[in-house]
């Protein structure tokens, strides 16, 4: 996809609260009024605990009408609880002559949401002394009901409610908070008790079981950690079980705070309750206040020390809960994010009891819970960040980038150390010069030839404090474990240019050894002053405002055993005799003379520090008659019998983003979704994937896929390569063909930004080997029929050092040479694949060489859209020439206002100004077939929709092969064909696209298989049926 960097940067300057931008496949810009949005790339809570217990959330009804809330729920949770909407007060509308009347519409919406998205729902609650209307206990004259009458009414209520949702609610809190340990018999003196005595408890469970025999039935209460209350609950439930009452579990609410109860007190209750045979435990209402009970404190912002205390306690709780996963089957948080918490309204003051801040950003508590899960992830991105989107990325006419002017600093006299055993990569996550929080994210790289004990390593970040205050630092997340990172604030004896302090980052022994060529992975750091007053970063030595992605920053220095081995200290910097030390202080360092070790050779291995090689699974794709391979004849793609076919497909990304599976499988069923794509007429699936992921697979390394196993139980226990095998097999079964697309080099959600097919560590040879390996794995299966070699090679020759070019040279940046080399190596393994080759960004005008630095000397268009070089320098694959397909990308004015989108543009003007000179001539002059690999956008009722209609119609008229961008809901500038549940289709957009899908004269969609029809609905056909019915050939136009 394309990006408009000027639009992004200008808005980053305007929007002060955006601390960083997370990218997946492409970058999006955000208007001024946009609030901080969730980071969709961070690990899913429920996925992280899929082997332990369900992770649920209580939500109010308003969440069901908020797309962001719904998407947050579906990403992180596989169970929901209606916060109030399924309580008696919400359901009961009144009495009638025949019984009770109800308001079910909101509760129905909750149950439908859970059912539609294939997640669980807990029913809360049937019997409670609170939030039950007073009239329920009275007759029509306002007099209290008799015991028998009240029990009869309760029975009707339970039958009506539980019966309505039979088979849809997996667990009910049947009786809630019936215990008061201060009473002589410990039963709460509620109206229930006053009329019925404790008998109502037994009856409620019996009737709930009769109404739905398969639902799990729970007794639910708070303060279950108090010994007296705990013991009575234990005895009551044990007695109920002994009498044969159908009770299946105890709900421990766990409304706790940072100081009480202790984790051991919670554990003691779990131990006791789980000793009752046949009883399971649900943590039903978990939240953790920053205040002690009865505290008069009222914070306007959350104190950092309390947030850290909260995160540590959450980690300890979840670590403990995992020990009891055989009895603890569900953990539900009572709220989605802090400003939704009941604690704010109940006590009338700010509180931050949950895992996400008000702006959906992940708190330290979230990362603590993730860390406790034991899940490792290559590059989580904590908030605040904008929504992760994949958006098309244009190449605009050069526009000056808006950046702050850096303040000059004097040249230091200290000697830089840059050739040692380690170096530091830095990413600035706070771009505002005035800020109350400094956010340097770091990676330590072992650039030497031997391993290094990280406990010997320290890093210094140099800055000015701008007003003496106590300071605190924290690692929100670190791949080596945040608990293994230490901090120390060191004041200099006298101020120097750019610094009067440095923050020293160290490592505990648990961080382990750093191997040659590897890095520590991301270390996310932030620090602040105790009163949250501002720093001015503008003059800080270590701050590089524009380095928002990882790069080498020599002003962040590194030391081994106190000896400078990387970077450049500010001139004259020496520590003061006294130091301000963070809570995780390490001993005072002794400064040693600067030493420049002997340079070690640079390693080129891909960093994979947390992944363990395993044997490569054998492909499970069965052998089949491989007669669906396709070939090139002039400007047509034909089958084995020389009959023209029409490839009309769609993109579904995720294998390029770190999801390690298609995005959306965190909420949808993989197989069902692939079948529905085929049912709706798409006969080709373009699969964006990273070369790094393929190379990892080839080395026996399988990054974990982000899958909702509740929705996809058949994928349980499968690694990412095995899941990809299932993708291929499922596509085979539904007649859907696949085109692989090397969308990016790295799987870091930003690799696509790099313009070519290699980077400083990933060599062209690595790129070729990745393509060869995956070709060889599936060479005997004609489900994968095409290989799009590299997504959008690009770069501006007039300003970029590295850019993709197109000529007959063997230059490392010559995309034509790289494409020919890669294609031949692929075809030597599988000569049957179609080779799809995209264009570049800029091509020189006549008599201009690639050395020109004038933008006016080049023709520029969308990334991947410039195929002008084919006329003079066509791809030459020798004996494989009948496999070459060219593939431009094209987008509309909502992505970027290209010069051809002038007022009143027409289809003919687009053809003359853009399409024909850049790529359409290849089809018109019968040079080769075209496959438009990406096109799509929003139906805005304006110019973008007009462009989409013109291109769609041009595609249809000429039977141009295409793959629409895209299926995904999370594609920012284009939108997708489905909503964020990845199951609800945008019918308006689909109807718009439908005419561009291959259909016969009866409107049946045509697949590219010769035996299997397309899809599973019995309505579509295959190539053989199409031609047996004497249907017309879908032939492209030519002059």
UniProtKB/Swiss-Prot annotation:
For the protein in the UniProt heading, the enzyme class is hydrolase
Name all CBM3 domain ranges: 418-571
Q: Where is this region: Disordered?
A: 375-417, 587-625
In terms of Pfam families, this protein maps to:
CBM_3 (PF00942), Cellulase (PF00150), Glyco_hydro_10 (PF00331)
Which Enzyme Commission number(s) are listed? 3.2.1.4, 3.2.1.91
PROSITE patterns documented for this protein: CBM3, GH10_1, GH10_2, GLYCOSYL_HYDROL_F5
Active site per database record = 177 (proton donor), 285 (nucleophile), 792
Organism domain of life: Bacteria
Q: What does this protein do?
A: This protein is made up of two domains: the N-terminal domain has exoglucanase activity while the C-terminal domain is an endoglucanase.
What is the protein named?
Answer: Endoglucanase/exoglucanase B
Q: Which gene name belongs to this protein?
A: celB
């Amino acid at each position: 996809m394309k990006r408009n960097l000027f639009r992004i940067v200008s808005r980053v300057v305007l929007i002060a609260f955006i601390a960083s931008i997370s990218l997946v496949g492409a970058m999006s810009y955000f208007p001024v009024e946009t609030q901080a949005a969730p980071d969709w790339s961070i690990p899913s809570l429920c996925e992280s605990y899929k082997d332990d217990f369900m992770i649920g959330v209580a939500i109010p009804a308003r969440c069901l009408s908020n797309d962001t809330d719904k998407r947050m729920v579906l990403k992180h949770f596989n169970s929901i609880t209606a916060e109030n909407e399924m309580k008696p007060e919400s359901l009961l509308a009144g009495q009638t002559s025949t019984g009770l009347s109800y308001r079910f519409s909101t509760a129905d919406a909750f149950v439908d949401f859970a059912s539609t998205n294939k997640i669980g729902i807990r029913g809360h609650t049937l019997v409670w002394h609170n939030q039950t209307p007073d009239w329920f206990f009275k007759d029509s004259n306002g007099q209290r009901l008799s015991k028998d009458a009240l029990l009869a009414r309760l029975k009707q209520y339970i039958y009506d409610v539980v019966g309505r949702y039979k088979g849809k609610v997996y667990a009910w809190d049947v009786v809630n908070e019936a215990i008061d340990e201060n009473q002589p018999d410990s039963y709460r003196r509620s109206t229930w008790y006053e009329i019925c005595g404790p008998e109502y408890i037994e009856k409620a469970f019996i009737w709930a079981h009769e109404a739905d025999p398969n639902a799990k039935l729970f007794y639910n209460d708070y303060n279950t950690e108090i010994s007296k209350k705990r013991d009575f609950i234990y005895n009551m439930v044990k007695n109920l079980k002994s009498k044969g009452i159908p009770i299946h579990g105890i709900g421990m609410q766990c409304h706790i705070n940072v100081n009480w109860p202790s984790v051991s007190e919670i554990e003691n209750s779990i131990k006791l309750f789980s000793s009752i045979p046949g009883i399971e435990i649900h943590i039903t209402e978990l939240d953790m206040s920053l205040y002690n009970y009865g505290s008069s404190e009222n914070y306007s912002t959350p104190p950092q020390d309390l947030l850290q205390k909260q995160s540590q306690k959450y980690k300890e709780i979840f670590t403990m809960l995992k020990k009891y996963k055989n009895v603890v089957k569900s953990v539900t948080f009572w709220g989605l994010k802090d400003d939704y918490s009941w604690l704010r309204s109940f006590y009338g003051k700010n509180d931050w009891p949950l895992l996400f801040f008000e702006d959906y950003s992940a708190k330290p508590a979230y990362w603590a819970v993730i860390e406790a899960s034991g899940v490792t992830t290559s590059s989580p991105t904590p908030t605040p960040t904008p929504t992760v989107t994949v958006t098309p990325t244009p190449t605009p006419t050069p526009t000056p980038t808006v950046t702050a002017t850096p303040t000059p600093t004097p040249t230091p006299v200290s000697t830089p150390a840059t050739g040692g055993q380690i170096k530091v990569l830095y990413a600035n996550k706070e771009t505002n010069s005035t800020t109350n929080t400094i956010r340097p994210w770091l990676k330590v790289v072992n650039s030497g030839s031997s391993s290094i004990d990280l406990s010997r390593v320290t890093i210094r970040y140099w800055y000015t404090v701008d007003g003496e205050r106590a300071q605190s630092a924290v690692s929100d997340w670190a791949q080596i474990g945040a608990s293994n990172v230490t901090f120390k604030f060191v004041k200099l004896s006298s101020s120097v240019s750019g610094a009067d302090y440095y923050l020293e980052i160290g490592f505990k022994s648990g961080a382990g050894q750093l191997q040659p060529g590897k890095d520590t992975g991301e270390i996310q750091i932030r620090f602040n002053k105790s009163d949250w007053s501002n720093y001015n970063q503008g003059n800080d030595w270590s701050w590089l405002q524009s380095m928002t992605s990882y790069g080498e920053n020599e002003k962040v220095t590194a030391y081994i055993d106190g000896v400078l081995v990387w970077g450049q200290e500010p001139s004259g910097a020496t520590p003061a005799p006294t130091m301000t030390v963070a809570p995780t202080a390490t001993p005072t360092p002794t400064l040693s003379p600067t030493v420049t070790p002997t340079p070690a050779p640079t390693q080129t291995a891909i960093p994979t520090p947390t992944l363990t090689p395993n044997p490569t699974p054998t492909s499970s794709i069965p052998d089949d008659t491989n007669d669906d391979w396709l070939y090139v004849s002039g400007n047509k793609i034909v089958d084995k019998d020389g009959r023209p076919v029409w490839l009309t497909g769609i993109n579904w990304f995720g294998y390029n983003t770190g999801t390690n599976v298609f995005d959306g499988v965190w909420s949808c069923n993989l197989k069902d979704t692939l079948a529905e794509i085929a049912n709706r007429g798409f006969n080709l699936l373009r699969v964006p994937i990273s070369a790094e992921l393929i190379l990892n697979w080839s080395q026996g390394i399988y990054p974990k896929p982000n899958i909702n196993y509740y929705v996809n139980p058949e994928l349980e226990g499968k690694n990412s390569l095995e899941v990809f095998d299932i993708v291929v097999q499922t596509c085979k079964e539904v007649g859907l063909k696949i085109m692989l697309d090397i969308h990016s080099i790295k799987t870091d959600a930003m690799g696509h930004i790099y313009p070519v097919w290699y980077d400083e560590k990933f060599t062209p040879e690595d790129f070729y080997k990745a393509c060869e390996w995956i070709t060889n794995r599936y060479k005997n299966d004609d489900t994968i029929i095409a290989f799009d070699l590299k997504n959008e090679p690009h770069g501006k020759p007039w300003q970029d050092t590295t850019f993709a070019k197109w000529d007959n040279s063997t230059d490392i940046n010559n995309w034509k040479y790289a494409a020919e080399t890669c294609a031949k190596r692929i075809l030597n393994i599988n000569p049957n694949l179609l080779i799809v080759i995209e264009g570049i960004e800029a091509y020189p005008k006549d008599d201009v060489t690639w050395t020109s630095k004038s933008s006016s000397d080049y023709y520029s268009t969308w990334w991947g859209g410039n195929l002008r070089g084919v006329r003079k320098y066509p791809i030459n694959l020798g004996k494989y020439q009948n496999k070459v397909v060219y593939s431009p990308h094209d987008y509309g004015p909502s992505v970027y206002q290209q010069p051809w989108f002038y007022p009143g543009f027409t289809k003919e003007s687009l053809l003359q100004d853009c399409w024909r000179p850049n790529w359409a001539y290849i089809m018109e002059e019968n040079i080769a077939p075209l496959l438009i690999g990406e096109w799509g956008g929003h139906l805005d009722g304006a110019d973008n929709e007009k462009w989409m209609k013109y291109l769609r119609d041009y595609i249809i008229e000429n039977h141009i092969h295409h793959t629409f961008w895209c299926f995904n809901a999370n594609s920012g500038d284009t939108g997708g064909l489905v909503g964020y549940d990845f199951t609800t289709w945008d019918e308006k957009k689909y109807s718009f696209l439908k005419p561009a899908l291959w259909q016969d004269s009866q409107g049946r969609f045509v697949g590219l298989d010769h035996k299997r029809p397309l899809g599973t609905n019995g309505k579509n056909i295959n190539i053989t049926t199409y031609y047996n019915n004497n249907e017309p050939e879908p032939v492209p136009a030519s002059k």
